[in-house]
A protein has these predicted regions:
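Conserved anion-binding
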Residues: 105-130
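Short, charged, surface-exposed secondary-structure boundary motifs
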Residues: 96-104, 129-132
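Beta-strand/loop-dominated core regions that host nucleotide or nucleotide-derived cofactor-binding catalytic loops
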Residues: 1-57, 62-64, 69-70, 91-95, ...
Length: 235
């Protein structure tokens, strides 16, 4: 049995074991596929760049590849065929993910699949760039060993300092990330909390915050759709 995680066993329970992992945990918003492990590599130059099929070659075999804003079904299929262990993305289009999973089911039915493969989404669904703060941290740990749990939306990077964190209920003045359209995946600063309740496009009355996004746009966003980004603590 392969556990795909490295660490010290703390306890054994019916149906599983608890392991203390010497590294940093990055939580995504979702994912798919099996648990995998491999060396972390970055295949894009910019967190908003799309991961193209041409960026996947034999050098990526057995590795966990960090992409950018999305990957097509063609790119995911090529990565799977080349023996890539896993893919980390800001987001992915629902249709692309469904098409990829349909291809995998057909290949599995005819016995054409071997090994495991996982996909982790860090920011959301659709074309969503990785938060630059997170991307810089991942890039700084290229070459480290990592374990990816696609279905659980988790990435462990071994022997790494604490990753940039997130917190709900952001406060005025904090850097935030939006998690719903039309601003999904975009970063900015919460400059004010609006008084009273305000209606969303769907008609629901919610508390809103005023966010100045990094492109200079000022927009109201439901506070429930925002997370504060926490800086990496000094070593």
């Amino acid at each position: 049995m392969i556990g795909h995680v490295r660490g010290r066993v703390q306890s054994i329970e019916p149906g599983g074991i608890n392991v203390d992992v010497p590294g940093a945990l990055v939580r995504g918003v979702g994912g798919t596929g099996a648990a995998v492990h491999g060396e972390l590599v970055v295949a894009v130059h910019d967190p908003g760049e799309e991961l193209r099929a041409g960026a996947i070659d034999v050098g990526a075999t057995g590795k966990i590849v960090v992409g950018g804003s999305r990957a097509s079904a063609e790119t995911l299929t090529r990565a799977r065929a080349m023996g890539v262990a896993g893919i980390v993305l800001g987001g992915v289009l629902d249709k692309e993910l469904r098409d990829f999973e349909a291809i995998q089911r057909r290949r599995r039915e005819v016995g054409g699949l071997s090994g495991s493969f996982g996909v982790l989404l860090l920011e959301g669904f659709g074309k969503v760039g990785i938060d630059p703060q997170r991307f810089a941290w991942l890039k700084g740990h290229a070459g480290s060993m990592a374990s990816l749990f696609g279905a659980d939306g988790l990435l462990y990077v071994y022997d790494a300092e604490v990753a940039p964190g997130r917190r709900t209920l952001p406060r005025v003045g904090e850097r935030v990330i939006a998690h719903r359209r039309p601003f999904q995946g975009r970063a900015g600063v919460l400059v004010a909390e609006l008084d009273d309740l305000h209606a969303t496009p769907s008609g629901i009355q919610v508390r809103m915050g005023l966010v100045r996004f990094e492109d200079g746009r000022l927009a109201p966003v439901p506070l429930a759709n925002l997370e504060a980004t926490l800086p990496v603590p000094p070593a």
